[in-house]
């Protein structure tokens, strides 16, 4: 389910939501739950890097394709980081 990225860089929440066909609130929820950690500008705007998008793709694969709930995703991400 890889979204097409035009170039390396940073992406605003609206662009990421459109690329992955998800609601911006979903991205905010993932951040609130600690699944994603986008950087922020001084004005508090979220910016997602290519690494954030790779992590999002992994999260969406777990949730959509495998049916893993958010608690399960959090555990899998923790295990993956070790």
Language-model-detected regions and their locations in the chain:
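Conserved catalytic core of two-component sensor histidine kinases, primarily the HATPase_c ATP-binding
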Residues: 45
């Amino acid at each position: 389910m890889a979204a097409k990225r035009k170039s390396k860089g940073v992406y605003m929440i609206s662009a990421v939501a459109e690329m992955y066909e998800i609601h911006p609130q979903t991205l905010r929820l993932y951040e609130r739950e600690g699944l994603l950690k986008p950087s922020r500008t001084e004005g508090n705007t979220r910016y997602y890097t290519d690494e954030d998008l790779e992590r999002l793709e992994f999260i969406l694969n777990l949730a959509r394709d495998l049916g893993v709930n958010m608690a399960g995703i959090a555990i899998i991400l923790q295990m993956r980081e070790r």
